[in-house]
Amino acid sequence: MTKRLNRRSFIKTAAIAGAGLALIPNKAFAGNKKPIPTEGKVRIAFIGVGLRGRNHVSNISKNPDVEIVAFGDISADAVAEAQKIIKADGRAKAEEFTLGPTDYLRLLKKPNIDGVVISTPWEWHARMAVDTMKAGKYAGLEVSAATTLEQCWDLVNTYEATGVPCMILENVCYGRQELAMLNMVKKGVFGEVVHARCGYLHDLRGIKFNNGVEYGTKSFSEAQWRTNFSEKMNADVYPTHGLGPISLALDINRGNRFLSISSAATKSRGLHEYIVEHPKGGENHPNADVNWNLGDVVTSTIKTSRGETIIVTHDTNVPRPYSLGFKLQGTNGLIEFDGLESGGIKQPDGSYLNTDRIYIEGKTEPHEWESAAKWFKEYDHPLWAKFEAEAKNTGHGGIDFFVDKEFVDSIKEKREPELDVYDAAAWSAVTPLSEMSIQEGGEPQFFPDFTRGKWMDRKAVDIK
């Protein structure tokens, strides 16, 4: 068990609280303007430079079109690490904002900032993005974008009042397999899509606890804040990694929308057992008495306006390998894969047996699965073919390169990002709505129409 603790990556080291700024309308961004290249470099600041934030720093620092101007974090040590990254890339030292939890507001007042990447704990995401948009700066917001319906509406309302874009930085939308799946959908491989499945299935016990089995104030990194959600909420608290790519495939907010969600949760056993069985835990450890609210597996069924269903699973408290559990099914066939180019099943010789599979009527052998490998290759997205060499050494198998590139490009071209504020609101709304559904015994909860009817006329995302 100790080995599991040591092999995890920890991110988002500090919570940064926020307060509102005066509303600063920016009509230059209102509506869907044609791309207008900016003069000079795109000036980027970062709020939150823990491990996740520093991953963004590392990626964006390699972009020659960018000037990195500021870091904000309550941890001076985290900022010092971020400074080392840009110094190694030959960049000048960025201005630092480390005077306390509201010092990011001083950062946002700086006139020499075009966009802000926000990588802080979930509960601060929405308020910081709202303040960023009010300051007239593009907001690049880590996932999930919001934890309440009120926060979802705050994001949308602020965008519509200011015209300043907000991009949800959902990196899995740029996964090679995920984009190949999207390509297959666009080219009609599956026929008319009727059903999908996705989720976040990831053993996070070694992230939710450290220093043995500590969390909160006695721990560090994500365990300081993420574990609190397992104690306080019974919901799908992290839906966007799986739901983002599926939403693009189903044209959510662009000709289709989520209508309702019905959710159920299992009992909670995994975190308690982890504590009592850990060498530094035990039955007498104070945390053995914690009443964990989050069910070990949360399952939600979403219905869409076009008649598809989506099953979304959250599974982070019990032992398991990583998976995003993708399935997409249409009138011609279906595909199933774990996502992020999972290695598959490890063989005795150390190699891996790929388990990605596809069935297309009339194209594959009747009633038999076929490896999806050649299909992924045939429908490889042009984005990957063009930028594979640049992406290969960046985070999460290259997908972080693409999400950061899109954020910077959208600022440079003065356009809406491919993943916008309506996506941020709709995908993140799964958390509060699933919580309400579980509390009401699985009763369906209805999604607000965050687009206020615009989903009927908005065009499908054209990732390029």
Whereabouts are the PLM-identified features?
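N-terminal glycine-/serine-/threonine-rich beta1-alpha1-beta2 phosphate-ribose binding loop
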Residues: 2-141, 153, 157-165
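Non-transmembrane alpha-helical segments in soluble domains
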Residues: 11, 57, 83, 105-108, ...
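C-terminal helical cap and adjacent loop that interface with cofactors, partners, or active-site loops
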Residues: 14-18, 29, 55, 247, ...
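Predominantly a Rossmann-like dinucleotide-binding segment in NAD(P)-dependent oxidoreductases
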Residues: 48, 52, 162-167, 172-292, ...
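A structural signal for well-ordered alpha-helical segments within the folded catalytic domains
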Residues: 54, 126, 130, 153, ...
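Short beta->alpha connector loops at strand-helix junctions that form conserved
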Residues: 142-144, 170
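Active-site beta-strand termini and strand-to-loop segments that position acidic
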Residues: 300-306, 330
